[in-house]
């Protein structure tokens, strides 16, 4: 029985093997009869990427990244490949507005797709052994096509790293508002 419990506690108690069920009773204030639900557990894949062709000639790839979750890089790559099959793409608009961030590894993987080489990001811990650097693998997969990244005050964390790395490597123009600013971000890339 959970009454007004924290979301993380409820979440942990409801997790279990796929295909098994959980009985859920919801009691509402000022309503005598509770609501009864039987919920079957399953894997839910969050769709973090949406895309479409834009522009007068439909030759710009618009990709909206809502967050950086476990499958964002695969979803992102699928969108790019579908664009390249349909038409000659002249550039990309990457929309990170209101993207709260997510998994650093996903931001690194997607950033790598647009860089020829070089450092994407480094993380520094209290100890020297906690310092890590992440580098792009050789090869810009979109072959230098222009990129515009849209950000706003809701763009945070991994989305700031993504936008910052593309800007530092002169691979993108950043448009919009200042980002959330939750990172201590400094650039070591050459100007």
Language model features by range: what are they?
Residues 2, 188-191:
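A short, hydrophobic C-terminal helix/tail in secreted or cell-surface proteins
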Residues 5, 10-184:
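Cleft-lining beta-strand/loop regions that shape enzyme active-site pockets
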């Amino acid at each position: 029985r959970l009454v007004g419990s924290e979301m993380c506690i409820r979440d942990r108690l409801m997790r279990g093997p796929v295909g098994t069920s959980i009985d859920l009773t919801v009691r509402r204030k000022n309503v005598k009869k509770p609501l009864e639900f039987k919920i079957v557990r399953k894997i839910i894949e969050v769709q973090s990427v949406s895309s479409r062709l834009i522009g007068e000639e439909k030759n710009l790839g618009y990709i909206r990244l809502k967050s950086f979750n476990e499958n964002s890089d695969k979803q992102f790559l699928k969108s790019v490949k579908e664009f390249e099959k349909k038409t000659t793409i002249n550039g990309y608009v990457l929309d990170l507005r209101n993207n709260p961030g997510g998994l650093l590894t996903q931001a690194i993987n997607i950033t790598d797709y647009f860089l020829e080489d070089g450092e994407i990001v480094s993380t520094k811990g209290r100890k020297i052994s906690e310092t890590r650097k992440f580098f792009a693998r050789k090869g810009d997969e979109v072959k230098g096509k222009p990129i515009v990244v849209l950000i706003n005050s809701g763009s945070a964390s991994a989305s700031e790293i993504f936008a910052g790395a593309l800007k530092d490597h002169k691979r993108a123009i950043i448009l919009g508002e200042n980002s959330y600013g939750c990172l201590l971000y400094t650039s070591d890339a050459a100007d």
